[in-house]
From Swiss-Prot:
InterPro entries: Aldolase_TIM, OMPdecase, OMPdecase_AS, OMPdeCOase_dom, RibuloseP-bd_barrel. Keywords: Decarboxylase, Lyase, Pyrimidine biosynthesis. The active site is at residue 101. Residues 169-179 have a biased composition (Acidic residues). This is Orotidine 5'-phosphate decarboxylase. Its EC number is 4.1.1.23. Disulfide bonds: none annotated. GO terms for cellular component: cytosol. GO terms for molecular function: orotidine-5'-phosphate decarboxylase activity. Substrate binds at residues 42, 64-66, 99-108, 329, 348. It is an enzyme of class 4 (lyase). It comes from the Eukaryota. Pathway: Pyrimidine metabolism; UMP biosynthesis via de novo pathway; UMP from orotate: step 2/2.
């Protein structure tokens, strides 16, 4: 049987034909950076996570996180850990993949994705799902992402102004109506007592009341404006040369196969994952898998594969061993060249190195070489 066309297609070619906007962006990013490397940043605290992302960022195209294992994760939307990761992603040119492995009924996974303290959808470009509960979980996540995207075309910017207190018995004709057209809502609050503003008495001896007019003005701004395009990047932060902003679309990877020994993801389960992906091509980017699962002519799903490891430097013939906890390892050459992976996921192979940048480059170079030999 002939190999699927995607196995011989370059990333730049696939970027032109794939339908998912985020997949197209990722393929372009891979081609621009000459990288098909994802770092699994399984670290214990937020400071280390940000440090690792900054050090390794130039070599990777995807950063995989587990926010719930990171001590000190700051959930503040604008300045917290997710926002700071997004800033580094923009600086170095990579996407954020929160390895949440959603695995529950549809309503629950939708809330886990969009609500709660983490609000994963706000900062993670990509998430994944364990489809054991059924296809409904994929459908619910897709619907949640679509609703979130629909709310993005316009943002409501609210400003509040408080007018000078005045006496109610003053002539209404003295009021300035110049801003009446801008006022969406106004609330009038009566202030009892003398707060330092002189109160005149009326002709019948009664004291006039003090009224403060508070105006709430709402302005609708396009979410595609340059103001939002900068996102949380500070002045001076620049995109990687030649790289545009990533699309606002979110993406899903379906956990179709695992690299751990004795896992229960059989062929029937994997096929169900493929069918669900085909039903939601506008949201599903591809799979976390151990082999390429594209089989129909119009399939162009991306495959990210964990369990990647290189022998120690200068010991290329050394045998790869598992970690003693069920993980099984393979080289980039096998995963990409033989199994058909598009992106290899590396964790401890880089994280435990004395020089993170050097080791990340070693993995990037090996994975890219395997890809170029595959499409040659």
């Amino acid at each position: 049987m002939a190999p699927h066309p995607t196995l011989k297609s370059t990333y730049s070619t696939r970027a032109e034909t794939v339908t998912h906007p985020l997949s197209a962006y990722l393929y372009k990013l891979m081609d621009l950076k000459a990288s098909n490397l994802c770092l699994s940043a399984d670290v214990a605290n937020a400071r280390e996570l940000l440090h690792v992302a900054d050090k390794v960022g130039p070599s990777i195209v995807v950063l995989k996180t587990h926010y719930d294992m990171v001590a000190g994760w700051d959930f503040t939307p604008e300045t917290g850990t997710g926002a700071r990761l997004a800033k580094l992603a923009r600086k170095h040119g990579f996407l954020i993949f929160e390895d949440r492995k959603f695995g529950d009924i549809g309503n629950t996974v939708e809330l886990q994705y969009t609500q709660g303290a983490a609000r994963i959808i706000e900062w993670a470009h990509i998430v994944n799902v364990n489809m054991v509960p059924g296809k409904a979980s994929v459908t619910s996540l897709a619907n949640a992402a679509a609703k979130w995207l629909e709310r993005l075309p316009y943002e409501v910017k609210t400003s509040v102004t408080v007018g000078t207190p005045r006496n109610t018995d003053e002539d209404d004709d003295d009021e300035d109506d110049g801003n009446a057209g801008e006022m969406e809502r106004s609330h009038t609050f009566g202030l009892n007592g003398n707060n330092g503003v002189p109160i005149k008495e009326s002709s019948d001896g009664r004291k006039g009341s003090i009224v403060s007019v508070t105006t709430v003005t709402q302005q609708y701004e396009s979410a595609h404006s340059p103001r939002l395009t900068k996102t949380i990047a500070e002045e001076g932060d620049m995109l990687l040369a030649g790289l545009e902003e990533p699309p606002l679309n979110r993406g899903l990877l379906i956990l179709a196969q695992m690299s751990s020994a004795g896992n229960f993801m059989n062929a029937e389960y994997t096929q169900a994952c493929v069918e669900a992906a085909r039903e939601h091509k506008d949201f599903v980017m591809g799979f976390v898998s151990q082999e390429a699962l594209n089989s129909q002519p119009d399939d162009d799903f991306i495959h990210m594969t964990p369990g990647c490891q290189l022998p120690p430097e200068h010991e290329e013939d050394a045998e790869l061993r598992g970690d003693g906890k069920g993980q099984q390892y393979n080289t980039p050459e096998k995963l990409i060249g033989v199994c058909g992976a598009d992106i290899v996921i590396v964790g401890r192979g880089i994280l435990k190195a004395g020089d993170l940048q050097h080791e990340a480059e070693r993995y990037r170079s090996a994975a890219w070489k395997a890809y170029t030999e595959r499409v040659r």
